[in-house]
């Protein structure tokens, strides 16, 4: 049997994908039954590292997603449009889809999965989160007996690289970002990474799978790492923490989830604390499995293509054994309930003001004896119980005060901060971070 | 639809399995379509923590595996016989099988998978390695596009617990084993764990999946942790290592694998070095994914039952969508080429003498100036190049000498040791360990 694959995109991931497809030795024998039928790109003139026969390449992507010969469309072009429209059109033409596009899935997952269900085809997306690290398929299949309670991930390699270097070198965010850009670890426009948007896309996808509901991306709280200073890294270190950009999804109650991305103080003994450089890791806590963690490279041509091609093979295996021969009343093939994303309702996400967490905050204040007392009283007035208040030093003639709270309601903490902000003795709230 | 499950065994894992099956809330909805049809045990009189209706329990296990109503047989009784015969009989009666029995699969995998292929049914075994940690399914599905080069695991919780305590407390093997037995972390008869046999079963299974061939268990080299002394842990620590019982499978060439279990010096910076206590982790290195690691609890009722029930659900999902409706010429359902273990040939395992590795060795010798020179010359004569030789101290009036080699052929190293053993100046080769 031969399964025909149409690729949309031949950039980093597309090239990695073709390289695996053309080199099946010592890989799964099913690879030999895959045929690259067409590859869609923007420009036919671009120099390519791969030696592809010219008649495979086309700029007519519409022709790929409607080609009656193609079984599986692989979307590795990225971006929102035309990626979204092409995926929907491929599904309408009853093609299975494999995609690495977290941005499109996080935003248009509802339309895309509804269209897939109606067409009786699969949309697989292992590459969209954690690069090659298996996490989508484990959530769907290997962990399906569990009640998932928490998913916590380091899912953005660029920010983890920057934070790791800030940690080891003691440098400031701006200079290390500039260096990371030079070295190719950060994009020229770093916004999606450093402002946490990419991580937010990914945790929205993971939360949707873990809690079997749809997630409105606009409800995912998202805070990046631009405001982290060398001082915060150093104080955190002294307190026994490292700072990581965490993407967190948590079942708060039967009705509500927390879904959020923000830099977080992580205890050094926590399994995520030692995940450094561009590595990603996803920690899942479920009942009755307890904690499991998945670790590896979250990006790059090889790891990402590993996930893309594995998804293609999983679909080829289904096609081969004729799964989908059982049909529903309207003739649509019945989809595997573990592999399809058939949930329809939206999860309710709790507002951040209701979050209960520990906080770390750093204040610059006038250097006189009553200040710590004033801060303490203000927090107390708002039911914010403190674990420690330390005058850590003097900076620019101001006293630097570091506060760590016990578990408190974020809403209460914010009200106290509002009041502190207005105190004439407080020059600056230099940083506010949550503690895991 | 309802899928009928027959359980063989209601001990630790069986009880955990029933607990999940009876509590589907917030778990995958497919759970609600599973029905426990029969549960086989040894004794009907035994007090059970579960309140199971009496007509479910039976001591007639044969009747379960031949019951025409049962779709899926779950073998969680353990041991070699009658487990093997019951599994084979279940397969002959075209029942899908889920098992947690690493001992039986490592020994009888060839018979069992051949019988499953002939019957056109699946044998799933996620629980057999790493408890709840997804590793079998990722190897079969999520990583299937890769050429796997290495699998290295900490796959035995008991030995990892003992070694971690030896590391943190500085105690000796014997006393910590006794304490571990008291605390329930080690069995009364600890042989299978501390002599590495359980880890050997597991790496044989992982190697078979990673390298798509069968493995003769008798060819798996296996060395336990009884001989590790507090002195070795302390010297390793000074050299920047921790000692872990590693199970290793490696592609040495197109023709040959290494498959081995032994205590190993692991650099403290290695991802496996910080896997402590009863936790397990499996590190897989593949092309093009690079390194990925899976971490979690490798045993216990909850984690193991998570894997067992997930396997049951995976089979139920297949049954539900009617996969297997495409049949071969003889009418047997065609099995999913990713999920079935259809490889027939045996892998060739290289003899240990051909292994190229670094070694650590500790000698007790007479305390006079020429001894280090004699050792060095002897190693040199056998092409064993040394990284360091240190007289580490005096023990019982003897000089304690610690040697670390560069990468050397194990055969050469052993010949040198034979010669050293016979030197009158050398009282004792106190320990020999490999270095990762
Ligand atoms: N790179 C990674 O490490 C990584 C990791 C995980 C997920 N992903 C995801 O994978 C996807 C692809 O990423 P990438 O890094 O491979 O991107 P890339 O290197 O920029 O490649 C994009 C490819 O798509 C083609 N393309 C883009 N827009 C097109 C259009 N409108 N019409 C026709 N062709 C178009 C480009 O054609 P030309 O070649 O002619 O310009 C190029 O071949 C993205 O969704 C990304 O988020 C990437
Ligand atoms: N425990 C773990 O953490 C763990 C982790 C991974 C894998 N596993 C594997 O899971 C399997 C089960 O382990 P377990 O710890 O659950 O064992 P267990 O607690 O000893 O339970 C064994 C069960 O099987 C029944 N049984 C045993 N031999 C029988 C026979 N000949 N006829 C009828 N019933 C028989 C026993 O019946 P009675 O109740 O009447 O005595 C008991 O219910 C083993 O293969 C083990 O290697 C266990």
Regions found by a protein language model. Name each.
Chain A
Residues 292, 296-302:
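Glycine-rich phosphate/pyrophosphate-binding beta-alpha loops
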Residues 312, 318-436:
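A conserved regulatory-domain signal marking ACT and ACT-like small-molecule sensing domains
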Residues 176-274, 279-281, 300:
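Substrate-binding/catalytic subdomain of NAD(P)-dependent oxidoreductase enzymes
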Residues 42-44, 78, 102-103, 110, ...:
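Short, ordered loop/turn segments at secondary-structure junctions
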Residues 83-89, 93, 102-140:
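Rossmann-fold NAD(P)-binding glycine/threonine-rich loop
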Residues 117-198, 205:
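Rossmann-like NAD(P)H-binding beta-loop-alpha module
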Residues 1-93:
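N-terminal glycine-/serine-/threonine-rich beta1-alpha1-beta2 phosphate-ribose binding loop
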Residues 96-98, 386:
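A short hydrophobic/small-residue beta-strand
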């Amino acid at each position: 049997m031969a399964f025909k694959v149409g690729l949309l995109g031949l950039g980093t991931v597309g090239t990695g994908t073709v390289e695996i497809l053309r080199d099946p030795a010592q890989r799964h024998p099913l690879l030999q039954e895959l045929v690259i039928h067409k590859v869609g790109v923007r420009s036919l003139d671009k120099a390519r590292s791969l030696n592809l026969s010219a008649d495979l390449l086309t700029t007519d992507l519409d022709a790929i997603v409607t080609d009656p010969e193609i079984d599986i469309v692989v979307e590795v072009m990225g971006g929102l449009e035309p990626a979204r429209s092409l995926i929907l059109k491929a599904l309408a033409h009853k093609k299975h889809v494999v995609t690495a596009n977290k941005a499109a899935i996080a935003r248009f997952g509802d339309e895309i999965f509804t269209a897939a269900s109606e067409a009786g085809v699969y949309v697989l997306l292992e590459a969209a989160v954690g690069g090659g690290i298996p996490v989508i398929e484990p959530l769907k299949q290997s962990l399906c007996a569990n009640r998932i309670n928490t998913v916590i991930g380091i899912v953005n390699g660029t920010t983890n690289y920057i934070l790791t270097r800030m940690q080891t070198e003691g440098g400031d965010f701006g200079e290390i970002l500039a260096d990371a850009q030079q070295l190719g670890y950060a994009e020229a426009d770093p916004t999606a990474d450093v402002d946490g948007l990419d991580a937010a896309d990914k945790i929205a996808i993971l939360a949707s799978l873990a809690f079997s509901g749809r997630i409105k991306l606009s409800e995912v709280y998202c805070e990046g790492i631009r405001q982290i200073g060398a001082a915060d890294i150093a104080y955190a270190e002294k307190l026994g923490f490292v700072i990581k950009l965490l993407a967190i999804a948590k079942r708060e109650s039967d009705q509500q989830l927390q879904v959020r991305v923000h830099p977080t103080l992580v205890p050094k003994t926590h399994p995520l604390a030692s995940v450094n450089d561009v590595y990603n890791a996803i920690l899942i806590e479920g009942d009755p499995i307890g904690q499991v963690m998945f670790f590896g490279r979250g990006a790059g041509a090889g790891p990402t293509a590993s996930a893309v091609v594995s998804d293609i093979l999983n679909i080829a295996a289904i096609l081969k054994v004729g799964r989908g021969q059982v049909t529903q009343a309207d003739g649509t093939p019945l989809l595997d309930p573990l592999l399809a994303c058939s949930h329809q309702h939206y999860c309710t996400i709790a507002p951040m003001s209701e979050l209960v967490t520990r906080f770390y905050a750093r204040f610059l204040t006038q250097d006189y004896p009553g200040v710590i007392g004033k801060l303490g009283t203000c927090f107390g007035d708002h039911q914010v119980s403190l674990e420690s208040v330390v005058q850590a030093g003097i900076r620019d003639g101001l006293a630097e005060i570091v506060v760590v709270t016990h578990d408190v309601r974020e809403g209460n903490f914010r009200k106290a901060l509002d009041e502190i902000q207005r105190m004439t003795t407080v020059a600056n709230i230099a940083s506010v971070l949550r503690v895991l």
